[in-house]
Amino acid sequence: YEIKVLSDGRTPLISESTYAFTADQDYAHSIAYPRLTYDYAQLRAATQTKPINLKITASRNGGSPMTVTQTWQLRQINDCPTYIRSRRLQTNGIIKNETMNVAIITLAGFVNENHPSIPRILSEALATGEIDSFSGYQEGTDISVLRQLNAIWKVLEKKGIRYSSIDTTTGSSTGVQHVRLIEDTLSTRQANCVDGSALFASIAIKIGMDAYL
């Protein structure tokens, strides 16, 4: 089998991606998961949901290719999938859809310990006088860890970040949640439980602590 995928546009979001594989047996049906060649800068810059057209070409045993055009949605960077539909091909050729909870993986993708705003936040935390340095777990005491986290908390509190429950997405779905990026949380001074947790976890990881969402 050979599969080619290409999106439209002057600068394609997905450049031509070719995937070839050999089935274990001469099956009447096969499911393929080609690795697509994305333009990651476009993905990162997407702040509005929009449609894109994909041309998919498949051929078997070097035969005449079959081409299908599909319209997909390019979701904005803030749309975080919490559930996905997994496909499993049964022996009778029927594709069975199964729902999987992936929130534990996808929400963690919004944690970014290398965000450029974090060094400034840490500097402001030191300026509070609550602590002399960020040592992570090196001092070996719970009180040391709590003092470091408390200094960070006070800086975020001083910035006036307030709770704001905005989790509805474009084409709202129960399987997708809107999550603010760190720069969005800091600039708007708004966060819900996920946004705030991602920000706080990012800072904690930066100073060498283990953080979990």
Each language-model region and where it sits:
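Hydrophobic/aromatic-rich core segments of domains that either
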Residues: T174-G175, V194-L213
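Hydrophobic (often cysteine-bearing) scaffold residues that line and stabilize catalytic clefts
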Residues: Q48, V145, G196
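Secondary-structure boundary elements
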Residues: T99-T188
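Hydrophobic, Leu/Ile/Phe/Ala-enriched alpha-helical segments that form helix-helix packing faces
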Residues: I56-R60, I152-L156, G160, F200, ...
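Short, surface-exposed secondary-structure junctions/capping segments
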Residues: Y83-N97
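Long, structured stretches of catalytic cores involved in phosphate-ester chemistry, encompassing
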Residues: A191
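Beta-strand-enriched, solvent-exposed domains that form extended recognition/catalytic surfaces
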Residues: Y1-R87
